[in-house]
Amino acid sequence: MTHELDATGLLCPLPVLKARKRLRALEPGGLLVLRTDDPAAIIDVPHFCAEAGHHLETQAEDGNAMIWTIRRG
């Protein structure tokens, strides 16, 4: 099952903190789709995934927003 988190309008570190909380609730291998328009997320989200042991599956642009698919490690 894929879970979604819309963090549009939130500035870092809030998108990463909310993603961390949501990922903790998922089983290993679970998917989270994170949407954010924070420009700092381009650096923060991949760094968070690498540090926390999660796998960044996809990264895409949608207008002013970025959409990340993260698989829980």
Where in this protein do the model-derived segments appear?
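Right-handed parallel beta-helix/beta-solenoid
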Residues: 1-6
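Amphipathic, hydrophobic secondary-structure cores in small proteins
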Residues: 7-58
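Short acidic/glycine-enriched loop/turn segments that link adjacent beta-strands
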Residues: 63-65
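Core SAM-dependent methyltransferase catalytic element
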Residues: 67-73
